Structure formats: structure tokens, C-alpha cells
């Protein structure tokens, strides 16, 4: 991928390099398999490639969370990507791992075994904490116990329509780029993609041969988002498949059992695109 064509991503890589070489704290990267976390991991690989061997001196953990009630197609893809990242990242001290909820905190253990009511909108949502947040926090805490402190990289974005220049020469790392975690002591949060708009994400991922550093095809990832309803930021990549509408790529692939929504739109799209085995049993 040519970073000269994407100066925003080049600047993010330079900023990442500054943060990475600042200290010896290991990085923890949340990877869901979606477009944002895929881009984040791509840029981490690209950054590490620019370093000398002696500068690569700490672990980068790529962490995927399997709730055990994921959409089967998304789950399979996430596991495959996590494994490939670990395989191709060994030379950069990248270690991939899939984490799971404790058996007594799984969705079915809570719902059937403990008699929890089903999660309901607007705010009764115990599932996210038990299935995703707690397993991740447990891994973070264990890593802190072994290393003292950690830096957590997240692929969250403001999704602004215009990109704000990210000058790094005069930016402080502590308290500016790295923010103390609100709940976990000795954990610091770094959000390098904050200002990157949607169309830049897809333009970068689908540039050139559209392959990731771990040799997966981003065109397949793009196909998982096909058919998403248009939003404020229309993707400039509708021409990827002229037979399908342009998309924003904003969709969230939820759990197949989710009771927080009336209709699982992502599941419906998979069914409409031929995955009829996903149709609910009557």
C-alpha cells in the first residue's frame, strides 16, 4: 500500500512510531475483524516495518473477543484473521490471541442457568460487559501484572467528514496521545485513527492489490459490508461492485441472538446474499 497516496495514513504511521519507541510498554490492540481494526493492524505492521531490528523490543498483542454468540460468518473470518496476524507478525513480536467469556458468564449460562432476563433496549444490556468487556479487562490486568503498564490501541473514530491535520512534532505523548484508562490502573489508551473519515478507511484498504500485511484480501472484507444503507458519508468505492449500491461500511456485526434490536440487518443481508442456512428455524 502506497502511503504517499494516503498522507493521512503516513502521518498516523509516523505518530505510531513515536509512541512505540517512546517506552517499553507492551501494546494491546483490539481486533474485531472489521474495517477499522483491520486498518489499525495494517498500519501497525507498516510502522514496524520501518523500524530497525533493535528497535522492535516489545510485544504487540492482537486481541479478538469471541462472545460465543457471534454471527457464524463473522466469527469464522475473525478467527482466520487473528491466526494469520499471529503467523505473519512473529518477526515483529506480534502475538495474536482470541479471548472468551468465563463459562459461568456466557450468554446461555446467564440466560438459562442463572435466569437473567434477555437484554432489552434502551439500557438493560448486561451482555456487553460479561461477554466482551470483562474478558478483555481480565487479559489487560494479567498483562499489567506481568509488565507494570500497557498501552491499549483502539480503532475508534470520530468519523468526521474532513480530516484534521495531525502534526506530531509538538505533541506530547503522555496525557495527550496516551490517556489513562478510566477503569484500569496502569493502562493507557491510544486512539490513532480518531480523525480518519470513512472513505479514507476503504480507499486505503482497497488500494493496490487490496492485500493486508498478513496476506488476506480486503475485497472479501468489503463484500461483508455490501448492501449497507447509505448514511452521511457515502463511500467513494461503489464502483467495486457495479451491481450493488455504494455503501458507507458503517455496519456493526452483532451477535446472532441479539435481543436489543427488532431486526438484525447484517444477518438479513447475509441471508439475502444467499446464506440461507442462517434463516431462523420456525
Locate predicted features.
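Conserved G/P- and acidic residue-centered "switch" motifs that form tight phosphate/ATP-binding loops
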Residues: 34
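Nucleotide-activated chemistry modules centered on ATP-dependent adenylation/adenylyltransferase
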Residues: 1-28, 37-282
Amino acid at each position: 500500500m502506497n502511503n504517499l497516496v494516503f498522507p493521512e495514513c503516513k502521518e498516523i504511521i509516523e505518530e505510531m512510531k513515536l509512541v512505540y519507541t517512546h517506552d517499553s510498554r507492551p501494546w494491546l490492540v483490539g481486533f474485531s475483524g472489521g474495517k477499522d481494526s483491520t486498518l489499525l493492524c495494517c498500519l501497525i505492521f507498516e510502522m514496524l516495518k520501518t523500524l530497525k531490528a533493535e528497535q522492535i523490543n516489545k510485544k504487540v498483542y492482537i486481541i479478538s473477543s469471541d462472545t460465543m454468540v457471534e454471527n457464524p460468518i463473522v466469527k469464522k473470518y475473525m478467527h482466520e484473521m487473528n491466526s494469520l496476524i499471529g503467523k505473519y507478525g512473529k518477526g515483529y513480536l506480534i502475538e495474536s490471541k482470541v479471548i472468551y467469556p468465563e463459562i459461568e458468564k456466557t450468554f446461555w449460562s446467564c440466560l438459562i442457568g442463572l435466569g437473567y432476563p434477555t437484554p432489552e433496549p434502551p439500557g438493560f444490556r448486561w451482555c456487553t460487559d460479561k461477554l466482551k468487556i470483562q474478558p478483555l479487562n481480565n487479559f489487560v490486568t494479567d498483562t499489567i501484572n506481568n509488565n507494570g503498564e500497557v498501552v491499549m490501541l483502539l480503532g475508534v473514530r470520530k468519523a468526521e467528514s474532513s480530516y484534521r491535520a495531525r502534526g506530531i512534532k509538538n505533541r506530547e505523548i503522555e496525557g495527550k496521545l496516551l490517556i489513562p484508562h478510566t477503569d484500569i490502573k496502569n493502562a493507557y489508551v491510544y486512539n490513532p485513527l480518531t480523525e480518519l473519515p470513512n472513505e479514507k478507511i476503504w480507499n486505503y484498504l482497497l488500494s493496490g492489490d487490496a492485500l493486508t500485511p498478513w496476506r488476506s484480501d480486503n475485497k472479501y472484507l468489503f463484500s461483508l459490508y455490501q448492501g449497507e444503507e447509505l448514511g452521511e458519508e457515502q463511500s467513494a468505492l461503489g464502483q467495486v461492485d457495479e451491481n450493488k449500491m455504494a455503501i458507507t461500511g458503517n455496519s456493526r456485526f452483532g451477535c446472532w441472538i441479539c435481543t436489543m434490536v427488532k431486526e438484525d440487518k447484517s444477518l438479513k443481508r447475509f441471508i439475502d446474499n444467499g446464506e440461507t442456512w442462517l434463516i431462523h428455524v420456525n
